[in-house]
Structures are given as structure tokens and as C-alpha cells.
């Protein structure tokens, strides 16, 4: 099992990320190990007060970093107000813990099933521009998984334009460890090829602007300790429960801290929020494994089998179908299809899918696509 620790710091009520990893042994009466929270001094970063020490925004491990106010790493959110204001910094207001998993309006997401889930909702706000945010964390203890999402609400009188909304951000201190990044690329017929490379200073990302998640890049990213194997070493995984445009990114800063972000791709993304309106970001499923890649994949397998897949065939063998494409390509008729169906039926196959070529003059790839009537 794992521990995930946050802290509210500074007079600006920043939400800082303290720790994510193997379970820490402490009780309610033991002070949280806030010494793990990395802070520093920043003579060139503005602060709203005149203390001698300020949180170094350009290295501080923000839980949901804003934009344009001193943190020059990848942001989780960017906005533009009706007056052209682009800076945003969300600050802690309050929080609540509920014994359920709230559904995301209009979006696919995991569900609790028979398992008891705890959900932490952090209520944040930028009082200057009038933007409220709920950071939503649900823990699935048996699968050792945390799901994350964000709901934004315009509390101002004027519209706010969202130009970037990441669903999750994870800041890690890696001064004592080097890490690799693992992504899944591919194309037609060779989907989800594993590619592992060293995480270097700067940003490394995968994404899609195709209107779909695509097999060119899968909406997944993992951070691995340099010596991690299939069965040993640390692995942090993020997976996006969304089939549209996405961006998954890892950034190694000048101070050797890592920031992982995942969400809707900001390219060509603008969402107008009128007064009182809300925007829900899709869900990220994240997990930590101290037992290498196998530990991570087992977490995801268990999670999706129990809490994402729906329907009667979740726990039993599914019906089998046959597709005529590889057998006939464009050249088929009724007799050919019936012959395939009869042979398939003898093997226990229950459905025949008639593929490309049944409409119009579709005898090759150069004509008639979409020229059909039912």
C-alpha cells in the first residue's frame, strides 16, 4: 500500500505535494513528515508579503500549479479573463472527505462497485479572477490506486476562458535518484509499443490532437527509477480515462524535481465559462509500485476489471465474432459471406461482421467511401 501526503503552506495557502510512495508508518498522533516538503528561497519570485523567506515558486512542489505568477515549470491550468488577465493561482479554502465516489458529469469514469471508497475534495479558489476549483481524489485501497479529476467554476461576474486544464499534476523530488520515462507509441497493426528512455532536463511529452487518443500515442505515462525492472524498483503510472485529445508530460527542472501532468491537450482548446458555470476535467488514474512494472500493471488490471468495465461479460467469457475483411477484402458476395458464416458457426463463433466494401462501387480504397444507403 501507499501514502499520499499534502500540506497547506505559506500565508498564500498554497497546496503543496509532500509525498507519494510506499506507505509511511505513523498514526494520527504522529506529526506528518512535512520535512519532506521541498522549499527554498527566491529573491526573484514575487510574494504577497514581506517575509524574509518565501516559498520558492519555481521549485515548490505544487499540487495544482497555476500560471504566470512565478512558477515557470509546466502549469496545470491557464485562463484568460474578459479583461485579458492571464495569471491564475489557486489557493486552499477548505476541504471535505466523503464516503463515496462522485460521478463526473458527462464523462466516463471509474466507479466504486462493491468497494468502499474515500474521496478527498480540496476546495481552492483564485479570489482575484473569481475562479473556484475542486480537486477530487478518490482512493481505491484494494487496488492501491488513486483517481484524480478537477471541476472548475466561474464565480466572477464576467466570463472566464479556460485555455488549459490538466486533470492531474504530480511533483516529485528526485535529487537522490535518476528516473526513466515509459510511454506507449505505435501505428496500425503495432499498437502500444513500449518505449523507455532517460528523463533529461526539460520536458518530454506524448499527446494527440487528432480528436481521439489514437494508437500513435497512448494516453499513458510512467516514471521509473533508473534501475527498475519488471519486478523491482519504483514506478509511478498515470493513465487518462478519456478518448479525445490529450497531453501527458514529464519535466525535469533545474533543481532536479520532476513534474508530471496529464489532461486535455491545450492546443486549440478554449472553453468559455459564464458566471456560475462549471467545467469537469476527465479522470486520471494513478498508481505507485515498489515492485517494478509488474506491480503497476497488476494495479491497473485489477482496477479496470473491477471499477471501469461494465456489463454482464466483465467476469465471464465474451461472445466471439468473425470479420470477413482479411478473408475477402473488397471482393465478396452473398455466397462468400454465407460460406464464412457456416464454417465459423461450427467453431462456436456467434456473429459475422460484414466489413468494408458492401456499399456503392467500393471495390478499392479510392472510391465510394460513405456512398451508401440502408
Q: How does the language model describe each region?
A:
Residues 313-374:
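Aromatic-lined carbohydrate-binding/catalytic grooves of carbohydrate-active enzymes
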Residues 114-118, 147, 258, 280, ...:
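Active-site-proximal, glycine-rich beta->alpha crossover segments in alpha/beta enzymes
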Residues 7, 140, 286-319:
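Terminal connector regions
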Residues 149-160, 166, 240-304:
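Extended acidic/polar, glycine-enriched regions
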Residues 2-5, 11-251, 267:
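Polysaccharide-binding surfaces and accessory modules of carbohydrate-active proteins
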Residues 146, 161, 280, 347-348, ...:
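Short loop/turn motifs at secondary-structure junctions
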Residues 137, 270, 287, 328-331:
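Generic amphipathic alpha-helical segments used as scaffolds and interaction surfaces in large
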Residues 2, 234, 256, 277, ...:
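A generic secondary-structure signal marking the coil-to-beta-strand transition
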Amino acid at each position: 500500500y501507499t501514502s499520499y501526503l499534502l500540506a497547506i503552506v505559506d500565508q498564500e495557502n498554497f497546496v503543496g505535494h509532500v509525498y507519494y510512495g510506499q506507505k509511511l508508518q505513523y498514526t494520527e498522533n504522529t506529526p506528518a513528515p512535512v520535512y519532506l516538503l521541498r522549499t527554498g528561497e527566491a529573491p526573484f519570485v514575487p510574494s504577497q508579503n514581506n517575509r524574509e523567506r518565501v516559498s520558492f515558486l519555481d521549485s515548490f512542489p505544487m499540487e495544482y500549479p497555476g500560471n504566470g505568477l512565478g512558477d515557470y515549470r509546466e502549469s496545470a491550468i491557464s485562463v484568460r479573463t474578459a479583461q485579458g488577465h492571464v495569471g491564475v493561482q489557486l489557493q486552499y479554502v477548505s476541504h471535505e472527505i466523503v464516503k463515496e465516489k462522485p460521478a463526473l458529469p458527462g464523462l466516463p469514469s471509474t466507479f466504486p462497485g462493491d468497494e468502499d471508497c474515500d474521496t478527498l475534495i480540496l476546495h481552492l479558489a483564485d479570489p482575484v479572477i473569481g475562479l473556484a476549483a475542486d480537486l477530487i481524489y478518490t482512493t481505491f485501497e484494494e487496488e492501491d490506486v488513486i483517481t484524480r479529476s478537477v471541476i472548475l467554476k466561474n464565480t466572477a461576474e464576467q466570463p472566464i476562458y479556460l485555455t488549459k486544464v490538466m486533470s492531474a499534476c504530480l511533483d516529485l523530488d528526485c535529487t537522490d535518484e535518476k528516473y526513466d520515462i515509459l510511454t506507449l507509441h505505435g501505428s496500425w497493426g503495432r499498437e502500444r509499443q513500449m518505449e523507455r528512455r532517460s528523463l533529461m532536463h526539460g520536458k518530454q511529452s506524448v499527446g494527440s490532437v487528432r480528436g481521439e487518443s489514437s494508437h500513435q500515442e497512448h494516453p499513458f505515462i510512467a516514471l521509473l527509477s533508473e534501475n527498475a525492472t519488471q519486478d523491482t524498483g519504483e514506478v509511478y503510472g498515470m493513465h487518462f480515462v478519456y478518448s479525445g485529445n490529450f497531453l501527458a508530460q514529464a519535466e525535469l527542472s533545474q533543481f532536479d524535481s520532476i513534474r508530471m501532468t496529464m489532461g486535455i491537450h491545450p492546443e486549440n482548446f478554449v472553453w468559455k465559462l459564464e458566471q456560475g458555470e462549471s467545467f469537469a476535467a476527465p479522470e486520471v488514474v494513478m498508481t505507485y509500485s515498489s515492485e517494478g512494472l509488474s506491480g503497476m500493471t497488476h494495479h491497473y488490471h485489477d482496477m479496470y476489471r473491477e471499477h471501469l468495465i461494465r456489463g454482464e461479460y466483465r467476469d465471464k467469457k465474451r461472445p466471439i465474432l468473425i470479420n470477413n475483411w482479411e478473408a475477402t477484402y473488397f471482393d465478396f458476395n452473398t455466397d462468400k459471406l454465407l460460406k464464412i458464416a457456416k464454417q465459423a458457426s461450427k467453431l462456436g463463433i456467434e456473429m459475422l461482421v460484414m466489413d468494408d466494401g458492401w456499399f456503392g462501387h467500393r471495390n478499392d480504397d479510392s472510391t465510394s467511401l460513405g456512398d451508401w444507403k440502408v
